[in-house]
Amino acid sequence: MFTERDLPEDVSGVRASHATGALVLDCEADFETLPPAQAEELGLLVDALDPTSYPEEWLPPEVPTQLRRYVGTEFTVGMPGDGGVTWTRQTDPPIVFVKARTEGSPEDFLDFLVAEALVEVALDRPEHFLGFFEGRYRDLAAATRLSPADTYQLAVALYDASLGLDTREVFRGWDEEFPRLHDAWVDAGERLQPRLSDLPREVATGRTSFPAAAELACAGVKHGLDVPTPFGALDTEAYRDHGADYAVTWARKTFEKLRE
C-alpha cells in the first residue's frame, strides 16, 4: 500500500530545508479514511500514529457525510478538494502522501506539489479547514446560506488562500535555489490567470458558482496573482493576522452585497 518515494535532488533539498525527517510515500490506491489494516501497515513505518478528532459542536446541522465522519476518530488523511498530494502530522514523523490519482501528472508539477506539501507540513497550521475555522465553521455556513456541499467547497478555498499567504514567498524565493520547482509554480499560476479576469462576470451570469469562483481566486492568491473583487480582500495582511474571524466577516459582507 505504501512505498517510500524516490525524491529528485531539488525536492530532497526542500525537505532538508523545511521538513527534515518527513516521509514521502507513494500510495497504491486513493483513500481518505484508512481501513484498520492499512492504518496498521502505516503504523509500522512511523514511530507514532495519533488520529485527530474534532468536536461535533463545530459542525452546522447539515454537512457532507465525509465531513461528519472526519470529526470522528477514524484515521483520515485528505478530504474532497485536497488533491492527490496530501500531508499529515497525525504521525511521527509527519508524512506526505502521493496518492494513486496523481498517476500521469506532469513530472515537474507533481514534484512541485510534493515540495509544496513539505513546506506546508512544516508550518504550525491545521491540515484541514475544520482545524482552521473550528467553531466559526457554523458561522460561515450561517453567513453564506449555501448548501452544505457549497459551504464545504468555499471553506476549502478560503483555507487554501490562508495557507498561500504563508507559503508563496517561499516559492518566490526558489528562483535560484530550486529553479525547476519555481518554474512549475509560476507555470501553474500563468494557467490560472486567464480565468481570473472574467470571474465576476461568470458569477453574475451564473456560468460559474460562487464557491467554484472562490476556488479559482484563492488558488490565485496562493500564486500571488491579481484577483478580482470581492476575492482581492483575501490577499491582505488582515487575513493573515485574523484568520478565520476575517474569513467569516468577509463572507458575511460579501453575501449581504450579493443579496442586495
Predicted features by range, described:
Residues 152-171:
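An active-site-proximal "capping" alpha-helix that borders the catalytic cofactor pocket
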Residues 178-260:
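Pan-zinc metallopeptidase signature
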Residues 54, 59-114, 118-128:
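Active-site scaffold of zinc-dependent metalloenzymes
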Residues 127-133, 172-185:
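Short acidic alpha-helical/loop segments enriched in Asp/Glu that coordinate divalent cations
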